[in-house]
Amino acid sequence: MAKSIIFSEEARRALEHGMDILAEAVAVTLGPKGRNVVLEKKFGAPQIVNDGVTIAKEIELEDHIENTGVSLIRQAASKTNDTAGDGTTTATVLAHAMVKEGLKNVAAGANPIALKRGIDKAVKFLVDKIAEHARPVEDSKAIAQVAAISAGNDEEVGRMIAEAMDKVGREGVISLEEGKSMTTELEVTEGMRFDKGYISPYFVTDTERMEAVLENPYILITDKKITLVQDLVPVLEQVARAGRPLLIIAEDIEKEALATLVVNKLRGVLSVVAVKAPGFGDRRKAMLEDIAILTGGEVISEERGLKLENARLDSFGSARRVTVTKDHTTIVAEGNEAAVKARCEQIRRQIEETDSTYDKEKLQERLAKLSGGVAVIKVGAATETEMKDRKLRLEDAINATKAAVEEGIVPGGGTTLAHLMPAVTEWAQANLSGDELVGAMLVARALGAPLRRIAENAGQNGSIVLERVKEKPFTVGYDAQNDAYVDMFEAGIVDPAKVTRSALQNAASIASMVLTTEAIVVDKPEPKSNKPAGGGGGVDDYDY
């Protein structure tokens, strides 16, 4: 396919135009008085969102070159979302402001490479400053504040996430599900829970709630498919003599063996429940190993030279209580702290070493199941459109709280960046010169963009608000919700330091790339043909 090649100023201006469009669509959502954006969907109802990265992903322009600009600035939002999980709108607004400032300087003859060096040095200085000003998150009140701000000033959500975090600990997993009611509810599971339920409903012990509850059971864990009754009989005899219930976790249990278990259960010979092993492939093996360590048993696997028919009671695990529903199994075990701790440490090391985001997520899930537990927030709303919007806001809020716990909190509402403007200006003038100084100064000027935009979205003059904030102490900022200047920590308007830092770093990275661009190569649009589609031989040529 033929390509168009555009050089220097023309190329940068085309990129800028694409960025202007995306930045404006995203920036309207910034702050407590930010508006929503409606996204048309080819299938299903339109989606109403207030989330920067979701809007950025939807925007596709007709002009190929402008679309390249959109893709670049979208990267700043996506990368911030991947790193910190929130702050995508701030990253977009910052990147746009830096590009606008930078292009003026490049047009005036500044050297783009020297500008880039200046930008990088200024960002490094600012990252250190943000870390200096960050306060650690000590109590659930601070967590609730971070979550509430991130969810669009929803205090109820803030309280719920703080409670979930309190229950499952810092390494626990908080997951979101679409609820069935109008209200959003929190459900916390103690112990290890995995997404596999009983194989047959005949195993239930509580017919009203349709769940099987086993008190102090033995747990048989195997990675093989159980097909023959002969394999199971020795195991069942040993457990029946011990007089305790039995939970079987296996790859699958075929008809004949399953029928034997059901008959034993119905006759009252043995209280037994069978579930399929969670996960797939290597992940399944790892999860079975986790369950074995948690319950003090071992995985009966032919790879280890262990056969089911020779299994003895001392290779079974045990738990205080097991609850099995049609979709989930929850194991509450105790007494194996040392082994569990060692396993958690091993998983933590794997998390540090892996590069794949998906693997990280799955390892984090395993760690949570072993160490803390799992909290599920069931998102409720009147309509599906509202539910999707709430779900996105909650996702941001959960990510923001995790980021806050990691690196602490700083004054929110664009305040931190605005207060750092004089500091970075002073530092740059003392340490840099020439075009590097110009690069650092363009970063300094761009830092006011998020606060300016928050004020404008609240119907105020952004530049006046920015100047007023800069005159005040570091923790004092502009509360757009109530149109007042307040101490941000006291008012609970805080941002995770990690979110502010990531937004700044990713915005600067994209701005540097755009400023150092000298040519763009894009596909030439195909000429539109005026001929009707398809030659002869269509359906219309025939009489039926």
From Swiss-Prot:
Cite a single Pfam family from the UniProt record. Answer: Cpn60_TCP1
One Gene Ontology molecular-function label: isomerase activity
Identify the gene encoding this protein.
groEL2
Q: Which CDD domains does the protein's record reference? A: GroEL
Annotated protein name in UniProt: Chaperonin GroEL 2
PROSITE patterns, A to Z: CHAPERONINS_CPN60
Chief site of localization: cytoplasm
User: Does the record bear Cytoplasm in its keywords?
Assistant: yes
Q: Which InterPro entries match?
A: Chaperonin_Cpn60_CS, Cpn60/GroEL, Cpn60/GroEL/TCP-1, GroEL-like_apical_dom_sf, GROEL-like_equatorial_sf, TCP-1-like_intermed_sf
What keywords are assigned to this protein? ATP-binding, Chaperone, Cytoplasm, Isomerase, Nucleotide-binding
Q: Which parts of the sequence bind ATP?
A: T29, L30, G31, P32, D86, G87, T88, T89, T90, G413, D495
Q: Where in the cell is it found?
A: Cytoplasm
Name one cellular component (GO) term.
cytoplasm
Q: What are the start and end residues of every segment in region (Disordered)?
A: 525-544
Q: Which GO terms describe its biological process?
A: protein refolding
- How is this protein organized at the quaternary level? Forms a cylinder of 14 subunits composed of two heptameric rings stacked back-to-back. Interacts with the co-chaperonin GroES.
Function of this protein?
Answer: Together with its co-chaperonin GroES, plays an essential role in assisting protein folding. The GroEL-GroES system forms a nano-cage that allows encapsulation of the non-native substrate proteins and provides a physical environment optimized to promote and accelerate protein folding.
Stated family: Belongs to the chaperonin (HSP60) family.
Q: Which reaction does it catalyse?
A: ATP + H2O + a folded polypeptide = ADP + phosphate + an unfolded polypeptide
Q: Which organism is it from?
A: Synechococcus sp. (strain JA-3-3Ab) (Cyanobacteria bacterium Yellowstone A-Prime)
Instruction: Cite the EC number.
Output: 5.6.1.7
